[in-house]
Structures are given as structure tokens and as C-alpha cells.
């Protein structure tokens, strides 16, 4: 059952993206591209959360962002022998300047205005439960372990400032 808001509410809406460059990828440059697509397809502002070293690589493109928040990156997460700085997304609730926020991976391509519909849902927190692999359409959905819950995906999150959303982000910080 779809839960839709009965009346539209005038609130601040925007997107927040996290970008910390690695030795392999320039995530800040990806964030610039993503912010341009967010503006073109969704018509909402984008806030960038990054570190000073990553920001230096896009200083000429800084105007694409509504605001830029500099944070100290958590480099303790390793993936394939490289630092994978992706642990700070639990801060999205506190860092977002918007009442209603889309949290997007910088490598997620916005190609339509469909994500705007998430703001019309009455839920205060939404994320994807399922993935669809184009090259492997029959692939099983991932679980955190064999005896665990289904994996929920943080590629796209919509949240509204509320007690429920705040509690979810506080829980994410503990994981």
C-alpha cells in the first residue's frame, strides 16, 4: 500500500551527497556531475559533504552546490586495500540544512524527476530493499549474513526531519 501525503506542505527540500576522493576515484568530481543532474531533473539544491583535499580538486565547480560542508574523513574503512570513506553518512540527518532530504551516492545517475515522488510519501524515512542487476537479473537479494535481515541499500535515501528519522540515523552511527 502506498502512503501518500494528503496535502503538499511547503518545506525546504534538497539533496546531500558525500564525496571523499580515494587513490582510485575522484568522488568529488562525480559529486559535481551528480549535483548538475539533480538541479536539471529535480530542481532542488545540493549540499556537498567533503574534506579539504577532495574539495581542492573541484574548487572551480564549487558554485554547483548550494552549500559545502567540510568534515574530517573517517579513513578506518578499508575495501580492496584502499581507504573507502563511506562511514560518515550517518551524519546526514545532522548535516542536512533541509527539512526533507535526498541522500544520494555520487555515482547514482539521476535521469528523471521520479525521486521527487518520495517527498510525497507520508513516511519519514525511505530506502531501497531490493536491487536489480542488469547483467544478472536472477541474482538473489543480499543479506547481511545467512541468518540475518535483508540488506537495505543507502544508494538513495529520503528522510524528513522527525524523531523517527533521527533515531534511525543515531542507530546507523552505532553500526
Segment roles from a protein language model:
Residues 1-175:
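Glycosyltransferase catalytic domains, chiefly GT-A lineage
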Amino acid at each position: 500500500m502506498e502512503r501518500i501525503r494528503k496535502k503538499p506542505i511547503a518545506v525546504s527540500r534538497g539533496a546531500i551527497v558525500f564525496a571523499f576522493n580515494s587513490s582510485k576515484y575522484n568522488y568529488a568530481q562525480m559529486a559535481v556531475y551528480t549535483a548538475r543532474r539533480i538541479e536539471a531533473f529535480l530542481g532542488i539544491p545540493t549540499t556537498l559533504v567533503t574534506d579539504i583535499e577532495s574539495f581542492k580538486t573541484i574548487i572551480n565547480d564549487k558554485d554547483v552546490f548550494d552549500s559545502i560542508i567540510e568534515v574530517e574523513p573517517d579513513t578506518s574503512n578499508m575495501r580492496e586495500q584502499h581507504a573507502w570513506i563511506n562511514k560518515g553518512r550517518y551524519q546526514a540527518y545532522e548535516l542536512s540544512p533541509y527539512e526533507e532530504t535526498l541522500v544520494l551516492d555520487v555515482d547514482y545517475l539521476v535521469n528523471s524527476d521520479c525521486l521527487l515522488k518520495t517527498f510525497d510519501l507520508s513516511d519519514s524515512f525511505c530506502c531501497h530493499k531490493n536491487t536489480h542487476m542488469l547483467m544478472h537479473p536472477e541474482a538473489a537479494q543480499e543479506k547481511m549474513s545467512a541468518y540475518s535481515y535483508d540488506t537495505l541499500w543507502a544508494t538513495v535515501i529520503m528522510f524528513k526531519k522527525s524523531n523517527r528519522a533521527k533515531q534511525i540515523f543515531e542507530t546507523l552511527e552505532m553500526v
